Amino acid sequence: KENIIRGLIAGLFSTITIAALTLLTYKTQYGIFLMASFGSSMALLYGYPESPFVQPKNIFFGHLLSTICGMIFLFFFPLPIYITIPLAVGLAVSLMIMLDVSHPPAGGNPIIVIMGSVSLDYLINPVISGTIIILAFGIILNRLILKKKYPI
């Protein structure tokens, strides 16, 4: 029964957060606020807010660091994509662990960056702006509505 309630709440809060990012992306002129890996972040943030992987520093710096890793390979290593993607993901995972900012969903960011050939602006929108919005919703929904200690 606990998993059913946890699942329903996580689904509802994920819907609310992704809806806000989607509205900002498609109904304003402010840019892109969505990134595929944000969907995975929702599952952890709202399903398991006590996890060390979804604390604010992990979400923010995990997404930022892994995106930068993808950009390093995209912009500075003109190698075949089947070489750059694995190297960028491996570097991102290694650095997240070494710097204690592991956020598993962010491990996919280099794939998004390299396959999408994104510009440097991608760091601002969606990475930085999107993660700040996600963290704001995470704190508000977990603390104020669920009365959970987040961040821990």
Listing of model-derived features with the role each one plays in the protein:
Residues 93-98, 114, 139, 143:
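Mid-sequence acidic-hydrophobic segments that form the walls
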Residues 1-68, 72, 77-86, 117-152:
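Alpha-helical transmembrane segments and their membrane-interface boundaries
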Residues 78-103:
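Internal alpha-helical transmembrane segments of multi-pass membrane proteins
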Residues 50-58, 96-106:
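Membrane-helix interface "capping/anchor" motifs
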Residues 74, 108-115:
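Generic transmembrane alpha-helix signature in multi-pass membrane proteins
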Residues 34-37, 103-109:
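Transmembrane helix boundary and interhelical junction motifs in multipass membrane proteins
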